[in-house]
Amino acid sequence: MCGIVGVTGKDSAVSILLNGLEKLEYRGYDSAGIYVNDQDGHDYLVKEKGRIDDLRKEVGEAVHGSTGIGHTRWATHGEPSVANAHPQVSADGRFYLVHNGVIENFEDLKQTYLSDVTFKSQTDTEVIVQLVDRFVTKEGLSTLAAFRKTLGLLGHSSYGFLLMDKEDPDTLYVAKNKSPLLIGVGEGFNVVCSDSLAMLDQTKDFLELHDGEIVVVKPDEIKITNQAGEPVERKPFHVDIDAAQADKGTYPFYMLKEIDEQPNVMRKLSQVYLNDAGDPIINDDLLTALKAADRLYIVAAGTSYHAGLVGAKLFESLANVPTEVHVSSEFAYNQPLLSAHPFFIFLTQSGETADSREVLLNVNDQHFPSLTITNVPNSTLSREATYTLLLHAGPEIAVASTKAYTAQIALQAILAKALGVAVDQPAATAFDVKQQLALVANGMQSLVDEKATFEKIAKSALLNTPNAFYIGRGLDYAVSLETALKLKEISYVQAEGFASGELKHGTIALIEKDTPVIGIITQKNTAGLTRSNLQEVAARGAKTVTIVTDSLAKDGDTVILPTVDERLTALLSVVPGQLLAYYTSLNKGLDVDKPRNLAKSVTVE
């Protein structure tokens, strides 16, 4: 959600901070700010409501420094405003703080320690910077000791903190709990960021931080300590991503670029996880743990949850293992009765989803095995799960996920094939996943090459509607949920996906003249039923659009999909939905990549 950047030891601190914040725009934000110090007695605080471009204009040419911190804020406490933007400042102007997370007990802390302080913002963050100042000025503690004491008062709150002391201007104080932060290691300088993408043009070597750790960062020194104040030794990891991969190139929006990248993502997964004979390359220990499970539990949120619905069908049909799919925010506080030998699979693009992590922590406490499937190496959920599989999809910047969704499904297909073969399931042995993913990649390419067709459909059916419905059965229902979410996210159309058999149980009352109803038909055993449902809504004036596999197509169908194995049709049927959402948003003049009120990485509950 919020983005954090910091740098010490670079004369170009201002441009590094602003460029870093721009690379974090995809996380979602409503205001931004920076604080820089030149270590010669000059410092600058600039905050702005709105976009980074607005902040950059406000900064201008006069602001300079060699150490600084920056932040993009996604409002949780207090409305979007300059006063509530970060950095937040102590009453005497000595301390500056940026923060991602939620301080659960900030009202109690205000009443207990700061009843005499006049606050300038509505944020929980200001409470923290005022506490640090109070412990330094009133109790004579050092900045580090005051910071540590403050952290000890926060209970189970989530936070990623980056603090500066005006009287020690080349030092950054860093702490985290349940919120991602990394230290980027340079030569004669160091950086801090909530996502390595922000600083890949400065360094590709990063130190991960664990919950409860505090770090003191200087230009030529990084000191990590644990909650007890004991030193922690840790080697940096290398991020093998070219910064250019995170650029739009010639595309107008990241989302379109990422839709177009999906065929190559399918091919990449085949290269990484399948040998020349088409056999899965999966860790033996992971397969052993999966074989020992009597039930799989897929836990995810948003688009990843929809990918999990498809994954469950793959595990059950190929490996004959019962599989449940749960929304992570519900599972975290309403855990169902579990089987005797559960195995948990966490689907998360970022590897930082707060709700999913809460479930994983509970799973670890119960000593159950787990797997994280994520696009981000060294992310929190990848570190804390028993096993990790990477999506290898490349950076996904647009808030609305596309290629990570299809990568999650494809990798679950490979894993289900591997497990099925390991437990001697004939269906898995017969399933040629390598050949099918090649067909999928080619099919995706044929679809993304027909952009003009999808723009025409979007303009005709979706551009001027206040609501839309996506229907299907089985796997098509799962895709209906995802494609409706895409339209909802980026074009602000009230779109709903539901099982087509439920039409007569209430939803058909909402159908009127020209209401768009998109029917997805890829499953032979339910094709006739879904067509019947579409005829029912058409008779009531609905404007119907059909997305149909070639082998099931009839005259008058709108979009014809290449034929692939029925278990993988979701990988193709979702692409038209992605493009319809994109072109609806584009022709409404909206910001496709950064829809209102949304964040790419949801790091608070």
Curated annotation (Swiss-Prot):
Whether Transmembrane counts among this entry's keywords is no
- Entry keyword annotation includes Repeat: yes
**Which positions fall inside the SIS domain?**
286-426, 458-595
Q: GO CC annotations?
A: cytosol
Q: Which InterPro entries match?
A: GATase_2_dom, GFAT, GFAT_N, GlmS/AgaS_SIS, GlmS/FrlB_SIS, Ntn_hydrolases_N, SIS_dom, SIS_dom_sf
Keywords associated with the record = Aminotransferase, Cytoplasm, Glutamine amidotransferase, Repeat, Transferase
Q: Where is the active site?
A: 2, 600
SUPFAM superfamilies recorded for this chain?
N-terminal nucleophile aminohydrolases (Ntn hydrolases) (SSF56235), SIS domain (SSF53697)
Q: What class of enzyme is it?
A: transferase
The residue ranges of the Glutamine amidotransferase type-2 domain are: 2-220
In short, the EC number is 2.6.1.16
State the Gene3D superfamilies in the record.
Glucose-6-phosphate isomerase like protein, domain 1, Glutamine Phosphoribosylpyrophosphate, subunit 1, domain 1
GO BP terms: namely: carbohydrate metabolic process; fructose 6-phosphate metabolic process; protein N-linked glycosylation; UDP-N-acetylglucosamine metabolic process
Record's Pfam families? GATase_6, SIS
**Which reaction equations make up its catalytic activity?**
D-fructose 6-phosphate + L-glutamine = D-glucosamine 6-phosphate + L-glutamate
The molecular function terms of the Gene Ontology recorded here are: carbohydrate derivative binding; glutamine-fructose-6-phosphate transaminase (isomerizing) activity
**Location in or out of the cell:** Cytoplasm
Describe the task this protein carries out: Catalyzes the first step in hexosamine metabolism, converting fructose-6P into glucosamine-6P using glutamine as a nitrogen source.
Q: Which PANTHER family match?
A: GLUCOSAMINE--FRUCTOSE-6-PHOSPHATE AMINOTRANSFERASE, ISOMERIZING, GLUTAMINE--FRUCTOSE-6-PHOSPHATE TRANSAMINASE (ISOMERIZING)
Extract the HAMAP family matched here.
GlmS
Q: How does it assemble?
A: Homodimer.
Q: Which NCBIfam families match?
A: glmS (TIGR01135), PRK00331.1 (NF001484)
Protein name, per record = Glutamine--fructose-6-phosphate aminotransferase [isomerizing]
The species this protein was found in: Lactiplantibacillus plantarum (strain ATCC BAA-793 / NCIMB 8826 / WCFS1) (Lactobacillus plantarum)
Traced from the root, the source organism's taxonomic lineage reads: Bacteria, Bacillati, Bacillota, Bacilli, Lactobacillales
Q: Which gene encodes it?
A: glmS
